[in-house]
Amino acid sequence: MRSFSALVFLLLAASVLAADDSNSTPPAPPKAAEKPVIDIFHGTKVLDNYRWLEDGNSPETQKWVEQEMAYTRGILDRLAGRDAIHKRLTELLSIGSISAPILAGHHYFYTRREGMQNQPVLYVRDSLNGPDRVLVDANALSADGTIALDWYYPSETGKYVAYGTSPSGSEMSTLHIIETKTGRILPDTIERTRAASIAWKLDNSGFYYTRYPKKGEVPAGQEMYNRHVYYHELTNDPEDHPEDSDPLIFGQGRDPEDWPGVSLSNDGRWLLITVEQGWTKTELFVMDAKANTPPTRITTGKNFRYNGEIYNGKIFITTNEDAPRYRVLVAEAGNYERESWKELIPQSDAVMQGAAVWGGKLFAEYEQNASSQLKLFDLEGKALGDVALPAIGTVYGSGGRWDRDEIFYAFQSYMFAPSIYRYDLKTGETSLWTKVDAPSIDPAAYEVHQEWFQSKDGTR
């Protein structure tokens, strides 16, 4: 058995650098022009000389990128032995990728990228172990493979899937809707849906979604801000119901940098709007979707992060409020007094990455000692035990539903290629659902050990 270590990568890098057998002087890197921009944050002036490089559509930026690429190639192409290393790394990096499924109705939706495909493909299974069926293949949408599948959201029953595509890495998606059974593309399209958040109504008739403004609707330069929440009703003739007529639900008059997301309760009554304000603060708003009342803020306005889910009239909130490693609080939907919130799962030594109600249980993901942990709780906060993982490694996605007795999680490690496992809530058994094949790697030939060392300040 061989021990696997990051030292392998250091030795590989050293071998590449040592292989440079050219004595010629490398070309000079391109010089980026300095164009000072000064921002004032909390009374402190911050100088940014390279703000202009953030505009990827600027001819000046594109010219600099071309020069930088030429410089990079001038360095890398001189390295002897590079072709052999490139070949082996290509083998290792071309095993593809896979995502945890999203469950809707009796369907299982997930993405997979095979080998050197430019874009992942959206597949659907109509039963647990049924055949995979291609639903959206972004690779077929352009000759050069540069149209990306950015995101997707199945409707509650899985009848439809809303998905976003964008060209050439722009990420400014256009929303499309496909019928799962037939593959028919509906006429509804919505532009400017970058990184969209979508919440379908339970009857598949429409959805709440986020959208950015058109040019001219906001001051110049603000088009990548002012993300608002709208509602769209499906229609057979979008000319009779253009996106511009979709009613605005949330965002008017708020900070242009707000980043709202949406979700609906399992009974379809409550719309939860989660508003990211930078990297350290989140606000939660709740709207009675049946009564169509204005959204009500339920958080305190303090500098904490919150993420929530409404199930059977209760709001389950994951937060770092007075808990830097996060905890779960619970409150009654409709009663937003902060004093009525109760702690359901206290913070622990591990850092909680998230929690969700699946199969009538709380499924919580933690990270400790650079490795993932999965734990189950009942809805009163009682610990029910851990979900055993295949090895020391990382859970990079999960999926489930409030009305299904199964949970899926995506797992990978140094020796495990990306794999999707299914946990049966009734039996407590875990099984492999699907995985990425890595034929050039033999996991049995390696061992993975986690070693600890003491730093200068005494920290282990």
Task: Please place each PLM-identified region on the residue numbering.
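Bacterial N-terminal signal peptides
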Residues: 5-15
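Peripheral, non-catalytic segments that deliver or gate enzyme domains
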Residues: 44-52, 56-107, 111-134, 138-460
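Boundary at the C-terminal end of the N-terminal hydrophobic targeting segment
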Residues: 16-19, 24
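Short acidic, Pro/Gly- and aromatic-enriched capping/linker segments at domain boundaries
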Residues: 25-42
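N-terminal hydrophobic alpha-helix used for membrane targeting or insertion
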Residues: 9-10, 37, 163
